[in-house]
């Protein structure tokens, strides 16, 4: 990556990937299946450790399930960290943290000046995403997303070790 054009392309690629990954939480929290149809390849795989879905239509359909609709109606939200992106020509790998946050219905409400009354939130889970991406004629697309909960098991640490090793 010596030329100015090469460096500019790398910056543009990373910004496009940042945008794609940053769009995931609002899509999940609003039930926007269109994001998954557009951002994921038709044969993409999402591997959540406990379950998988294959194909962008199947992945998008998860958002319309009664279970997902119930949790977003209850205030659940996804909060993503900035991904670490490694470019490899027309493919890329991104590693990022993802917090799943829920209203804390059991806490006593607290008033904060200028911010109103709230019982606060709690981190329901914290995990690691690995995003495998491919450059297409329509921009970067997800070919595979793997998520592992940071719960002391090996899966999440393996994903983090990949990012730290580079």
Where are these regions (language model features)?
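Short, glycine/acidic-rich beta->alpha junctions
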Residues: 16, 75-77, 124-125
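Short beta-strand edge/turn micro-motifs at domain boundaries
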Residues: 91-95, 116-158
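Short structured motifs
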Residues: 21, 78-82, 128-129
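Flexible, surface-exposed loop regions and adjacent strand-edge segments
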Residues: 111-113, 160-163
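Short helix-capping and inter-helix turn/linker motifs at the boundaries of alpha-helical repeat units
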Residues: 11-15, 73, 120
